[in-house]
């Protein structure tokens, strides 16, 4: 992936200028495409990858606690109800508490207000402001959204890998056992998206490059519109769920700060137009090695048990799945 430090620029700019100063002097390509923009400006980002990596290190964090996953991170950022549910599941007491965290606003779409704390949202929003005001060029997060931050690119990859291993992957495997087994969500790609007037205001119907997606609304309140609309999935092809795979219905989900939504990546969806204000969300895609996205369902006897789901296996942060 392009997000690992490359040889290009790794030694820093000539003349002893700091990496941060050199990165701020770059003129990045302006993101324009609202569809198929995965490789927009590819040469620029490849050429300056090492320099940008060093610049983010030099900038440093605003909220250091966001950058290291562990007990302190969990206490501050993971909702107490999820911590309790995860502890019970790991102890072999089953997933009753974990399932009780969710409701199903649309068939096949699961929502919860009890995954992350208000401190997580506020600290991450503050970090995004710190990153956005840094002057360091930032690559578009995916092929459709033009504005956001690739979290694995700015130093957050280790903490996010810990979060995925401990909680996000087990929850995805619990909710979608027919798609997520031991090798189907070993890697992740984490980014934020921002919707506002003058930027991206909506997102066309699409499927994600993931087997399962976590989408957390950071806020802050005050926007209008911008619901997430899901479409009944069926048919064939890489980016659709086979009929009979699982319940995957149609309907709208209205975001509010703190609402997390988990859905199959191939459950087609769109972001409806934002009518006012601004909204930021953090999104984590889960997928297999080499960007593989499973769509063929496992038979019941092939699915993981609850105990197997909550045995953490280390994941890897990767670049955009289309580059793997």
Go through the PLM ranges and name each one.
Residues 4, 11-19, 44, 146, ...:
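Polar low-complexity intrinsically disordered regions enriched in Ser/Thr and small residues
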Residues 89-183:
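Non-heme Fe(II)/2-oxoglutarate
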Residues 153-164, 198-205, 244, 312-317:
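Short, charged low-complexity intrinsically disordered segments located at boundaries
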Residues 173-307, 324:
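Catalytic core of non-heme Fe(II) oxygenases with the double-stranded beta-helix
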